């Protein structure tokens, strides 16, 4: 393997991937088709092989169209999930978060509803980023070695050796793992030593001490300034506008850091996602019984594959690793399709009609009851997508370890939260939508709901605090290696029952 933490031009990936898709379309000719602006709401199970995925249904978010897809093999690639927990940005900036607002947890919810296992759903990521804009800190941390200090001018990193000793040997690793650094920020915040400031202006002072040649110094400062602004304008334009709004020149003033809201991203510094089959030559034999067949990146549901954020227990893929995993899953699905040439998806007209009625039900609910009140936003007969989302986020934030409690929770809090989630789940039937955009929001809410409950139930099942900087349990505030296992969750759509499975953590390296 090569070096880690190498700077990349990640914003250019989309162009490269789009070129590959364009080339594939050219090769396929009339057989190729790309459909955009389609919201996939459900996966379809084959009616002759009920444990096999045979397609999907959804609707256009721009036109009055209902889509039914039949397939020999299906790949779910919808990113992770944000806004399951309440974002810190409210009101004018509502929804501003570190992850794109359009990742609604569909990759997790669809696998779950299809009968698949999810793993590590308690392991959310909490990125420490620039306050309110969530701009990237990597360039400053890694490239320019920019110092970060608490409000009394001290460093929080390494300031709490006694508390972190509970998580040895992980807390002693170099570099310090992200959950440990985050936990140090939490401990520092509990002492009131906030805000945290990244002293970008100190980098300029360091350059002045290190470089005596005026021309070289000017060149170095110019490079620093252009790298900083370019990084934000490429990735997080709001970061640059936030500086301007606060009259901050990063060459002259420090910038505030803050831990963000919790997000689900199985390809970054956490490992939530689907329990997936590994390569035949590396996957331990104890895991094989979970899968209907041996194909790399296939979920526990036959014919359903995923990659990137969809694959659980496989953290730190980032951009390049997700790209590689995409290539791996592409080869796997081709092999699966070739091995199953005789298979023809069986989906009845009755099933197609049932899902159509289900998907568009929020329209009917709205039209039936909209005149009951003087304003359509508040109505005793239905709930709007926004109000459903607010309720979900409030429950998750206050009971399941959001920023509202400084990422802390407990069994009693989680039990109360799961009870409230069950009440919220009853209101899925009462979601209403006045247009296609709200219909999309309604189904995003449903997907986020399933992700939230999977998270809460997994956190309740785990009797330790394995990632204290992402979330910790007041009643199990330590690392317990007798609990060193994968906690998986399943959902039965027919009985509406959840089940927890524990699988051993078997090192393969």
Pin down the residues of each PLM region.
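Long, amphipathic alpha-helical stalk/connector segments used for oligomerization, subunit docking
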Residues: 339-434
